[in-house]
Regions:
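Structural detector for internal amphipathic alpha-helices that build alpha-solenoid repeat scaffolds
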Residues: 327-334, 352-364, 374, 385-396, ...
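C-terminal subdomain of the subtilisin-like protease fold in secreted/lumenal serine endopeptidases
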Residues: 142-145, 279-344, 348-360
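Short inter-helical turns and helix N-cap capping residues of alpha-solenoid HEAT/ARM repeat scaffolds
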Residues: 349-350, 379-380, 411-412, 442-443, ...
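Extracellular S/T/G-rich loop segment that most often corresponds to the catalytic His/Ser-adjacent loop
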Residues: 36, 52-65, 193-279
Length: 487
């Protein structure tokens, strides 16, 4: 191993003791809507009939089968994301450096819904699959839907009301039936869109693999703010890096653990917590559970993101009180520009209204390039991201120089990412002097662009290894920086 084994995920979530392998999540069904599929692996065989794969095919027929009966995929990467989610939820106990690691809800029933995500017609297939599960899977007692790719095929920068999203439309019936939808809030500030208020949106933070909360810090590229309806997202934060699961990559590698990460991992852990609580407190409603997790989370000091860190023990302690008050559901107003003049709304004092208007005008192709440039000076990063992403790559050498100037003065990481993405297109090797300094930017997409730029010229430049870990950014960039200093 090239790193110390982190604390068990259950400790990092604030459990006072490890989840019981036989009872945590018992009687609770979780539908996992994944971004690819799931592959068969011996590490999930212990789930036996408690794990199913429901597939919706292009002709809208539905099939269901046990994961254990599936053939091993020839493509070893296919189904990996789904497998990691299942392992984080339900892997068997393993002893690592005198600490027991176990899935958060190993007794739950897991239904993996493969609906051909991120391909044309996915919304209709997702709706069909959920309808089938709710009709035919009564014995599964579905209480939770875990979605790690809710955005579907939407442009993730263009801001719209969330009701227009195909996933939101497909899951509307399930939400109305009181099923808790838990979804990842997004991995980088490069994007604008965030989940609807009806979902429990999960962001992440850096816990350095430790349960000790004094060591926790914000993730520097964490997306947060108002979604297309004007509602603040995310609701809650969970660890997002170095989430331990049993090693699944090669059975003879000698490795004992693999690592899950990103807000897909964070959301999966929270789904496990929800299943654990539903099994302990069967009378809990989805709305009440969501409220309790947020209300009894812990603020993260030094963070502008208002979402708290999850703390399971705080929530359980409150639930065990006899005098707990009743929770009253609140309905928040939604921002909409449907009845407004776009050319008036584009100058609104509300940045969400400006972003919604700019999105419509851009999609209608009603703005000149000069007008788009004017929106790169907007006070809102949401608006600037839409403008810069729409500009795309520089049109000529003069505009390319302007990109570099704007990049230098841009304070928001996501906007910098879009300038860098534009500059990456047709970038000459002679520009190396402009690229080096961005190898340690806090924004993932900026560093990704630097890495991709260097990869275009491997015979000329050292390479930059990509990392999501903010503590490793400068370490990964050190060889490149030392090479450049020695020139």
């Amino acid at each position: 191993m090239d790193r110390a084994i982190p604390d068990p995920t259950w400790k990092r979530l604030g459990f006072a003791e490890q989840p019981d392998f036989h009872t945590s999540g018992l009687g609770v069904g979780i539908v996992i809507i994944i971004i690819d599929s799931i592959k068969q692996h011996h590490l999930v065989n212990h789930l036996n009939t408690r794990i199913k794969c429901v597939a919706v095919h292009e002709n809208m027929t539905v099939s269901v089968r046990d994961i254990s009966s599936m053939n091993r995929e020839e493509d070893n990467r296919k189904g990996e994301h789904g497998l990691m989610s299942v392992l984080a939820l339900a892997h068997e106990p393993i002893l690592l450096e005198e600490q027991i690691h176990v899935g958060i809800a190993p007794a739950a029933t897991l239904i993996v819904l493969d609906h051909g995500a991120f391909t044309t017609g996915e919304g209709e297939r997702l709706k069909k699959g959920m309808e089938w599960i709710l009709e035919h899977g009564v014995e599964w007692n579905i209480k939770i839907i875990l979605s790690t790719g809710w955005q579907a095929l939407d442009n993730e920068v263009y801001l719209k009301n969330t009701s227009e999203n195909s996933t939101v439309k497909a899951l509307a019936t399930a939400v109305q039936q009181g099923i808790l939808v838990i979804c990842s809030n997004g991995n980088t500030r490069l994007n604008n869109i965030m989940p609807p208020i009806q979902y429990l949106a999960v962001g992440g933070y850096v816990d350095r693999g430790k349960a000790d909360r004094s060591l926790h810090v914000p993730f520097p590229d964490e997306p947060y703010g108002r979604n297309g309806d004007g509602h603040f997202r995310p609701d809650i934060l969970a660890p997002r890096l170095h989430l331990t699961i049993p090693s699944y990559e090669t059975e003879d590698s000698g490795q004992r653990v693999s690592f899950y990460g990103g807000t897909s991992g964070s959301a999966t852990l929270v789904a496990g917590v929800a299943a654990h609580l539903f099994s302990q407190f069967p009378s809990l409603s989805a709305e009440m559970l969501r409220h309790l997790l947020v209300e009894h989370g812990e603020p993260l000091e030094g963070n502008d993101n208002l979402a708290p860190r999850i703390n399971v023990e705080n929530t359980i302690r409150y639930m065990n009180r006899a005098d707990k008050p009743r929770y009253i559901t609140k309905t928040l107003p939604m921002i909409s520009i449907k009845n407004q003049n776009l050319y008036s709304a584009i100058h609104s004092i509300d940045d969400t209204e400006r972003a919604l208007s700019l999105t419509v005008l851009v999609e209608r192709d009603e703005l000149s390039r000069e007008e788009l440039w004017s929106f790169t000076k907007d006070s809102s990063a949401i608006v600037r991201k839409i403008a810069v992403s729409t500009l795309g790559e520089p049109m000529n050498e003069q505009e390319r120089k302007l990109y570099w100037v704007h990049l230098m003065h841009e304070t928001e990481g996501g906007v910098r990412g879009w300038y860098m993405h534009g500059l990456l297109q047709n970038a000459p090797k002679e520009e190396i002097h402009n690229w080096i300094k961005w190898s340690t930017d806090i924004n993932w997409s900026v560093r990704w662009c630097v890495s991709e730029y260097l990869a275009q010229y491997p015979e000329y430049f050292p390479q930059l290894e990509k990392t999501q870990d903010p503590d490793a950014i400068h370490i990964k960039a050190l060889p490149l920086r030392e090479w450049y200093t020695a020139l």
